[in-house]
Regions:
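Bacterial N-terminal signal peptides that target proteins for export
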Residues: 1-11
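C-terminal motif of bacterial Sec signal peptides marking the signal peptidase cleavage site
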Residues: 19-21
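Carbohydrate-interacting regions of secretory-pathway proteins
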Residues: 24-30, 35, 39-331
């Protein structure tokens, strides 16, 4: 009998606790989330982004800014040039932006959703084929250098004979790079040609000529394209010959001169670039905001190779490619 009474009292106590826990007046302050929303300011700035599909990674770039309380976004997608995005919003620590289907070659817009954890943005996006891909992004490095650069010894990247020291991006390509009469020749619609060495800061001398209606480019650290073309007279100035593609336009605008040998002398320190064309400065000590379309990766803090674009149309010829890297800075 005493055992039954004790059991009844215990059951009543458990029931009372359950009712109290479910009551609107119950004190849940000790277990409620107290994590504050991530402020909008934490999202602002330049981001080096990597988009991951089931079989490939695509380097991309994103810049978020705010003007008069309105968010703005500029993006370099899987290819092409930097472009403003039509929609971007940050709500309760959640980022959403849209890359239009026309820019992505997709059936519908690519909608990016993501959150910020520590110093990393991550999330998902609707892929061109309708599946879901993932993406991550880290703040782009400032790449600010101080002191005076000390130049090392010049290195000839092309020996005038063969492709020694270079690797094509596709080993099974139907059209390939060739050496003809001492010149490197782009395949036209073929693979890229990537140098085997990696460099951080340097001076680069390149001699080239173009067939009519042709297109190529010189990629610095494998990430920043200095454009070469005779096929884009109607493009904006920052996509024509002499430009850092999609970002920096040459001044003055350069004529297209098929069949003529021309030179680039390029100096890249951090993300500050100077470009000379045939001995005349066309881009003077300007900042490259981020990677350009076709970059090998988005890891801007790391050294990277020189690569020559072969995936565009026509034929471009290179006969001299010499790089002079820096030695450690003198403080």
């Amino acid at each position: 009998m005493k055992l039954q009474r004790a059991a009844s009292q215990f059951a009543a106590a458990v029931l009372a606790l359950g009712v109290a826990a479910c009551s609107p007046e119950a004190d849940t302050s000790k277990t409620a989330s107290t994590t504050p929303a991530v402020p909008v300011e934490s999202f602002l700035g330049r981001w080096d982004l990597t988009l991951t599909s089931p079989d490939k990674e695509y380097p991309s770039w994103l810049e978020l800014s705010q003007e008069n309380g309105q968010l703005k976004a500029v993006m370099v997608g899987r290819w092409g040039n930097a472009r403003p995005l039509p929609k971007v919003e940050i709500t309760n620590g959640h980022l959403k932006f849209v890359s239009p289907k026309e820019e992505e070659g997709a059936r519908s817009d690519m909608v990016f959703d993501g959150t910020l954890t520590g110093n990393t943005l991550s999330g998902t996006t609707s892929a061109p084929d309708g599946t879901m891909w993932t993406w991550t992004a880290v703040k782009a490095p400032g790449l600010k250098e101080s002191g005076t650069p000390k130049w090392g010894k010049p290195i000839a990247l092309f020996n005038g004979k063969d492709l020694s020291g270079w690797t094509m991006s596709k080993s099974d390509a139907k059209t390939v790079w060739k050496v003809e009469k001492g010149n490197l020749v782009t395949p036209g619609g073929g693979p890229e040609l990537i140098n085997d060495q990696k460099f951080q800061d340097f001076k680069l001398h390149v001699e080239f000529k173009c067939d009519p209606d042709s297109n190529s480019g010189v990629y610095l650290r494998g990430r920043y394209e200095v454009q070469i073309e005779t096929d884009s007279p109607n493009d904006p100035p920052n996509r024509r010959i002499g430009s850092v593609y999609g970002f920096l336009a040459p001044s003055p605008d350069l004529p297209r001169e098929p069949g003529k040998w021309q030179t680039y002398d390029i100096t890249l320190i951090g993300r500050i670039i100077t470009v000379m064309h045939d001995g005349k400065t066309i881009i003077d000590n300007q900042e490259i905001p981020g990677i350009t379309g076709g970059a090998l990766d988005s890891g801007e803090a790391s050294p990277g190779p020189i690569y020559l674009q072969g995936s565009e149309k026509g034929h471009v010829y290179f006969r001299k490619i010499v790089i002079t890297p820096t030695e450690p800075f003198n403080q």
